[in-house]
């Protein structure tokens, strides 16, 4: 699960109203299109509303929130959205130090250096959402 830290973030949100993906996309993931990084937060109804890993089929519209509009704000992200280097895990994340960057598969990976361009995140706190989670500051925009 990926959540905004404060509801006021929706007041300044930038949504691409015509964003579609050429491939299937998992809800609650990250997607970069045309150099813009989005967090995909579609509203899901019915039986799938509270399930993890709900797939939005290729060609369907996406609620893609442009992360550049939220620079300096925070997201809360479950650990399941983070990939680690071999042998590393949640215990290796250090608040105030660990950096994360989006991967092409929609998850975030731990990185030791900030990318030269594009959105990345700095872990500010370790918290609990539906399990182990982190609060991240949106940076690099």
Question: What role is predicted for each listed range?
Answer:
Residues 1-141:
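Surface-exposed, low-hydrophobicity beta-strand/loop segments enriched in small/polar/acidic residues
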């Amino acid at each position: 699960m990926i959540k905004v830290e404060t509801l006021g973030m929706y007041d300044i949100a930038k949504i691409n109203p015509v964003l579609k993906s050429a491939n299937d996309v998992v809800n609650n993931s990250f997607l970069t299109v045309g150099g813009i990084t989005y967090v995909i937060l579609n509203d899901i109804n019915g039986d799938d509303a509270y399930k993890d890993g709900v797939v939005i089929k290729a060609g369907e519209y996406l609620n893609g929130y442009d992360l550049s509009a939220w620079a300096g704000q925070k997201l809360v992200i479950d650990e399941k959205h983070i990939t680690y280097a071999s042998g590393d895990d949640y215990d290796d994340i250090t608040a105030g130090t660990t950096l994360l960057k989006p991967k092409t598969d929609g998850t975030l990976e731990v990185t030791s250096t900030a990318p030269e361009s594009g959105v990345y995140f700095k872990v500010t706190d370790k918290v609990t959402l539906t399990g182990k989670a982190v609060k991240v500051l949106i940076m690099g925009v």
